[in-house]
């Protein structure tokens, strides 16, 4: 089996892997100005691991010509990919920064084929099976089989902590458990050098600080990714009796994933959390009034690169009793990272100094180092191809030192497994 890395090799973003010159796994986009896309591909079929921009962002561009390869995914992933594509059009449509058109996005629905977990199907002459990856609703490990080789593409994944009491993982989705036999594994390595704190401890620190801020007369803005993180934080707030508003794309995503209770750990808990939260429907004036209420606002974007956070954060920036509570990693070069590092950031075109307290809480939906190593324990004899990380080469070297057959391919490289 030949595996070519078109993107996501030795980097996080624009994931794309071509199997046997015919089956494409993911086709993502690396955010930036302009966004970066993988190397060109002309597949016979596409299989998608999950609905995050770095895995689906460039998908519509595959349909810009005469070819119409079928796109295989879970139902939640299909819906999330469409939401992201339309958001990209809203932000960049009609410019050179957008690699596709409204027509291309419409064509995705024409070639869409959905599958559940554990249901094998044919794609470009390969037998393919999805398994829950525990990352976001609908996320999948992808097992690809031809006549000679079984290849497991982990996609992004998260595992529960079996030793944790109470909250051992995400509230939104159950962790990855399936370990199908495979001859080769393409494994993500986003946090291959990081150990996450126990999820229960992170939740408690977050809830305590948020509640203390509100009791002290402050307002809390929680920048959160629309997909996965907004829903997770809603459930945490509900579990700790914290009232909150929700704004941004996360509102639509919450409604969307609730259509698929079988892809959630506890759909009733998310439904209850949604019912207790207040969804913001007004414009800038209402947002400013909410920011003055000493309340909690969960809003996009997670790294302060846009969205309603551009209104809320400047409104609360001037007083130290307020709080900006980041819930995810802040990538170098983003306003969120700048705010963490310097106490100021460019928000909506204005340089803003933030006197409010700024905290960060690790609600990661990726496996940490122990989680990745635990996963790979089931594949001692398999070839390991490390991707989706900033230190793929280093992690592959560590695996080889432990007797593994491991390597970190470069973008454009083809590996035979």
Task: Please describe what each predicted stretch is.
Residues 11, 279-417:
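C-terminal regulatory/interaction regions
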Residues 2-47, 52-56, 61-228, 232-233, ...:
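His/Asp/Glu-rich metal-coordinating catalytic cores
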Residues 77-79, 251-252, 329-332:
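Short beta-alpha junction loops
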Residues 152-154, 158-160, 188-196, 267-273, ...:
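Acidic/glycine-enriched edge-of-secondary-structure segments
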């Amino acid at each position: 089996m030949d595996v070519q890395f078109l993107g996501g090799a030795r980097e996080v973003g624009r994931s794309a892997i071509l199997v046997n010159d015919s089956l494409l796994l993911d086709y993502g986009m690396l955010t930036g100005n302009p966004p970066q896309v993988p190397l060109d591909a002309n597949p016979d079929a596409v299989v998608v691991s999950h609905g995050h921009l770095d895995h689906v962002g460039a998908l519509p561009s595959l349909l810009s010509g005469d070819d119409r390869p079928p796109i295989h995914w879970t139902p939640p992933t299909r819906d999330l990919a469409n939401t992201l594509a339309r958001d990209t059009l809203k932000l960049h449509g009609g410019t050179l920064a957008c690699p596709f058109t409204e027509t291309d996005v419409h064509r995705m629905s024409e070639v869409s084929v959905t599958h559940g977990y554990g249901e094998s199907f044919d794609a470009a002459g390969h037998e393919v099976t999805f398994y829950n990856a525990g990352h976001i609703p609908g996320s999948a490990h992808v097992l690809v089989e031809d006549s000679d080789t079984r290849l497991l593409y982990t996609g992004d994944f998260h595992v529960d902590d079996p030793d944790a009491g109470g909250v051992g993982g995400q509230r939104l989705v159950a962790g990855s458990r399936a370990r199908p036999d495979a001859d080769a594994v393409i494994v993500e390595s986003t946090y291959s050098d990081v150990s996450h704190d126990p999820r229960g401890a992170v939740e408690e620190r977050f809830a305590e600080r948020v509640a203390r801020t509100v009791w002290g007369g402050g307002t809390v803005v929680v920048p959160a990714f629309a997909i996965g993180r907004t829903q997770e934080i809603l459930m945490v707030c509900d579990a700790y009796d914290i009232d909150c508003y929700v704004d941004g794309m996360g509102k639509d995503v919450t409604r969307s994933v609730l259509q698929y209770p079988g892809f959630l750990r506890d759909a009733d808990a998310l439904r209850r959390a949604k019912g207790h939260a207040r969804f913001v429907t007004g414009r800038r004036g209402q947002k400013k009034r909410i920011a003055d209420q000493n309340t909690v606002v969960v809003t996009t974007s997670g790294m302060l690169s846009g969205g309603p956070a551009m209104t809320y954060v400047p409104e609360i920036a001037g007083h130290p009793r307020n709080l900006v509570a980041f819930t995810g990693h802040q990538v170098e070069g983003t306003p969120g990272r700048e705010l963490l590092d310097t106490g100021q950031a460019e928000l909506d075109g204005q340089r803003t100094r933030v006197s409010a307290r700024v905290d960060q809480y690790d609600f990661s939906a990726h496996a940490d180092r122990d989680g990745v190593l635990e996963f790979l324990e089931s594949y001692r004899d398999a070839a390991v191809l490390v991707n989706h990380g900033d230190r793929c080469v280093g992690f592959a070297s560590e695996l080889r030192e432990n007797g593994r057959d491991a390597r970190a391919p470069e973008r454009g490289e083809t590996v035979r497994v």
